[in-house]
């Protein structure tokens, strides 16, 4: 399939053309100019994306065209590394469509572009899916065998993800691809941890963490799903059904002391978690609450253990909520923990790692929610139960296991964020970093003005082991390796120099995944080593990512880069919205509602879509729901759309940080639009080759058309509309308004170039009109190429030997003339509306003689409305059917 038609070639003319091409071509590295072009396919009337995409992917990659080409201006972007938990989904395709469009555009405006790809080890996410897979296969495993299985998983899915990148047309430099657990990344992680520790920013402490019993690890905030629970809702937790969406009110026995007199009574306290009464150490009221501040002293007792409790005051207590008094359980609630720290309260831990009660007595070894029932019954027996009321609540759930998370105190490694956060705020305020869209800056400030310290420890096997070594005396030594740890410890602890190497045991925990990915912009360039790439390409130019990880990832990259390199990691941040399914849910592998971009590119039957769900790690319930949704939404499967149509569609949705509900029908529509581009190019190729054949000209000769002094009304209009598209797309890229860019070129090409200009050229084949037609086709495919790289490269290759990627973006043509051709088009639109009732029957048109139309306008109107029989001027406007 090709546009290229056989033509006679004269030897001398060929030599002349080659010389002209050499003189006119922009300077590129020799490997680009020498890159052999792929063979052209046989002609076909329709565009078939599959062979074209395969051909050009092979060509680009085999000729290393995605590697940076030396230029004075640099543009560097790191790809947010997708997790190796499975295949890419449409959300990743959105990311690639945006980033790759930017990179391809920057090449066209003569920038040296480095686009760095990679993948993330995704600690907890990967460990979860690999364990599920091993359990499916009924395999037993220890840490060593598990890690072996996980590396195999990485090789399988990591390579699959990279293949998907390439199928999407991603112009990243794959010779520099990184993985967050590569040896180089491991060195960077170790150096970063040790450096931050030496700066006093990393410490070990007992604090509240989110504990997942099913996975036996702490979680980061992004791994928590907050479930809104309605009143009196039954949920299956810890293996059985329990009631949630209720609040309990109990009476706490209290002594009130005022002016030396004591009185006894009760304070009613509301809680959604009666089981935690076992760990209560205090009650708390607001310092402005006169009901309690009037007493000299309040002495409560725990209604279960009957131990004496403290009574404290804190603004966290809301005066208008029930009695205005909170129960304080510092070991199992983050707010209570902070109140406990302020008031020097003790921490009573009541759950073990299996969420079972560890306090001796009637509740010992009970599951937490079974203990809840017993606590309620006990307080009923003591006449201390007041009521149970319906209550809407929010529950923290593990996004990986769907377990109800338990706040617990654990000794972990922490990173102090307060000082680093101030630097991150300052970097944005001083515009060292610009955030797009601008409204996201408010979220940035809000988050960094109240930063929480970062829990770094994870009780996992898959990840970067924490470079901390413990000796029998309980001392932790932070070091870059065991040998350094031994030397450091013995220097600081001379009394224990007898410790052997085996006495230094490395922490079993691994670091939070976000720690390694927080180093991504500079570690991918070789940090902590000093090298040419780091000097040349850091800081990077732009970080483009989803709005949902602005703080979890972007913020941490900024903090760590400023602290470890003294520089911002990137100069700009661009955020995009989240791609959601037809029901508004975020696409998630665990829900099974993801769309594989390859299914859209290559097409997929309903059977293929259903089989793909079964290959995942879905729960039985999620599998049933996912299958039902697929059968409803894709009963006939997905037709072949191609990568260009998918990319173009995704960019057409890109409007700030608004979320996106992808409609596959829209992708199919743009697949047809690709065919429109193809057929337009076919026509232009045909008429251009006729001139070349008759006049012995080259394609470059035909592009050497000076329209700056052209006064032909049609050409002046074409120049103006072309110029508008160039200006609009430049502005859109500058402001990252991709919806505006794709709409602009789509409307121009379809409605102005195809529906008007080409239709006129079919009837009026002057050389100048054909030359302009050729010029605008080439300009259009250059403008299309950042969004549709495959079809545009294929079309361009039919005329020229160099890659479209390393040409130049079209420039504005400055033409001083004006034209009334838009009035002609408006009249055509009005006539079409008036003759619609006559169908395809011939009509006579009378134009008002007062309107400014000439013979050329009449000719254009006749061409563009083929069912006009006659057209003439009269005293008024009229359309009538031919008798």
Curated annotation (Swiss-Prot):
Catalysed conversion reaction: tRNA(Val) + L-valine + ATP = L-valyl-tRNA(Val) + AMP + diphosphate
Superkingdom of origin: Eukaryota
Protein name per the record: Probable valine--tRNA ligase, cytoplasmic
EC numbers: 6.1.1.9
Family: Belongs to the class-I aminoacyl-tRNA synthetase family.
GO terms assigned for molecular function: aminoacyl-tRNA deacylase activity; ATP binding; valine-tRNA ligase activity
Biological process according to GO: valyl-tRNA aminoacylation
Motif ('KMSKS' region): 586-590
Species: Vairimorpha ceranae (strain BRL01)
Gene3D superfamilies found in the cross-reference section: HUPs (3.40.50.620), Isoleucyl-tRNA Synthetase, Domain 1 (1.10.730.10)
Annotated TM spans: none
Motif 'HIGH' region location, chain numbering: 82-92
Principal subcellular localization: cytoplasm
């Amino acid at each position: 399939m090709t546009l290229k038609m056989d033509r006679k070639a004269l030897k001398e003319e060929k030599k002349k053309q080659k010389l002209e091409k050499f003189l006119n071509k922009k300077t590129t590295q020799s490997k680009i100019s020498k890159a052999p072009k792929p063979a052209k396919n046989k002609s076909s009337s329709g565009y078939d994306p599959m062979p074209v995409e395969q051909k050009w992917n092979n060509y680009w990659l085999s000729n290393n065209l995605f590697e940076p080409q030396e230029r004075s201006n640099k543009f560097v972007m790191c790809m947010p590394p997708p997790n190796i938990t499975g295949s890419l989904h449409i959300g990743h395709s959105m990311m690639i469509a945006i980033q790759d469009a930017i990179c391809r555009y920057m090449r066209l405006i003569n920038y040296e572009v480095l686009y760095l790809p990679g993948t993330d080890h995704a600690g907890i996410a990967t460990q979860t899916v690999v364990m599920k897979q091993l359990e499916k296969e009924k395999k037993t495993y220890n840490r060593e065998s598990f890690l072996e299985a996980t590396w195999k998983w990485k090789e399988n899915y990591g390579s699959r993800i990279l293949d998907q990148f390439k199928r999407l047309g991603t112009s990243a430099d794959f010779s520099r691809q990184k993985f967050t657990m590569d040896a180089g990344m491991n060195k960077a992680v170790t150096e970063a941890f040790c450096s931050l520790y030496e700066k006093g920013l990393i410490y070990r402490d007992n604090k509240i963490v989110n504990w997942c019993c099913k996975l036996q690890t702490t979680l980061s905030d992004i791994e928590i799903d907050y479930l809104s629970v309605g009143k009196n809702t039954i949920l299956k937790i810890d293996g059985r059904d329990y009631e949630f969406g209720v609040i309990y009110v109990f009476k706490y026995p209290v002594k009130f002391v005022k002016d030396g007199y004591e009185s006894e009574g009760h304070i009613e306290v509301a809680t959604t978690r009666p089981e935690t009464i076992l760990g209560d150490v205090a009650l708390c009221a607001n310092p402005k609450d006169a009901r309690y501040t009037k007493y000299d002293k309040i002495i409560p007792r725990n209604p279960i253990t009957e131990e004496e409790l403290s009574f404290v005051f804190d603004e966290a207590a809301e005066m208008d909520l029930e009695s205005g008094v909170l129960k304080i359980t510092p070991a199992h609630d983050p707010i209570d923990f902070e109140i406990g720290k302020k008031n020097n309260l003790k921490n009573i831990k009541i759950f073990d790692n299996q969420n079972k009660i560890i306090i001796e007595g009637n509740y010992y070894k009970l599951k937490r929610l079974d203990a809840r029932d017993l606590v309620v019954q006990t307080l009923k027996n003591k006449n201390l139960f007041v009521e149970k009321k319906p209550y809407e609540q929010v529950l923290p759930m593990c996004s990986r296991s769907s377990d109800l998370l338990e706040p617990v105190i654990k000794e972990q490694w922490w990173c102090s964020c307060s000082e680093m956060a101030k630097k991150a705020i300052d970097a944005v305020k001083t515009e060292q970093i610009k955030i797009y869209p601008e409204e996201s800056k408010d979220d940035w400030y809000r988050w960094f003005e109240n930063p929480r310290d970062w829990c770094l420890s994870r009780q996992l096997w898959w990840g970067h082991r924490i470079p901390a070594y413990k000796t029998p005396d309980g001392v932790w030594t932070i070091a870059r390796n065991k040998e350094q740890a031994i030397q450091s410890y013995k220097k600081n602890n001379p009394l224990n120099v007898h410790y052997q190497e085996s006495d230094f045991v490395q922490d079993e925990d691994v670091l939070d995944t976000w720690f390694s990915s927080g180093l991504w912009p500079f570690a991918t360039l070789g940090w902590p080593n000093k090298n040419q790439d780091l000097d040349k390409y850091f800081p990077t130019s732009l970080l483009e990512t989803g709005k949902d990880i602005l703080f979890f990832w972007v913020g941490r990259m900024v903090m760590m880069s400023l602290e470890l390199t003294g520089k911002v990691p990137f100069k700009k941040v661009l955020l995009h919205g989240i791609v959601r399914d037809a029901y508004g849910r975020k696409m998630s592998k665990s829900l099974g509602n993801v769309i594989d971009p390859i299914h859209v590119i290559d097409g997929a039957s309903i059977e293929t879509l259903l089989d793909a769900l079964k290959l995942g790690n879905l729960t039985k319930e999620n599998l049933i729901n996912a299958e039902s949704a697929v059968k409803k939404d894709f009963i006939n499967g997905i037709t072949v759309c191609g990568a260009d149509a998918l990319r173009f569609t995704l960019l057409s949705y890109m409007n700030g940080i608004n979320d996106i509900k992808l409609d596959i029908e829209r992708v199919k529509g743009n697949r047809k639009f690709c065919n429109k581009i193809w057929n337009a190019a076919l026509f232009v190729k045909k008429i251009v080759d006729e001139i070349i054949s008759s006049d012995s000209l080259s394609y470059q000769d035909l592009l050497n058309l000076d329209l700056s002094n052209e006064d032909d009304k049609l050409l002046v209009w074409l120049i103006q509309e072309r110029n508008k598209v160039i200006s609009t797309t430049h502005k859109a890229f500058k402001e990252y308004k991709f919806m505006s860019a794709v709409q602009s070129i789509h409307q121009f090409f379809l409605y102005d170039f195809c529906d008007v200009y080409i239709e006129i050229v079919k009837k009026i084949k002057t050389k100048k009109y054909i030359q302009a037609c050729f010029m605008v086709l080439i300009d259009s495919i250059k403008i299309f190429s950042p969004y549709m790289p495959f079809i545009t490269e294929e079309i361009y290759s039919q005329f020229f030997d160099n890659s479209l990627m390393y040409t130049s973006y079209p420039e504005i043509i400055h033409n001083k003339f004006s034209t009334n051709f838009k009035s002609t088009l408006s009249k055509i639109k009005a006539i079409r509306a008036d003759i619609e009732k006559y169908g395809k029957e011939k009509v006579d048109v009378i134009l008002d003689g007062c309107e400014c139309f000439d013979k050329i306008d009449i000719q254009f109107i006749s061409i563009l409305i083929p069912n006009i029989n006659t057209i003439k001027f009269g005293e008024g406007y009229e359309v009538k059917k031919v008798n």
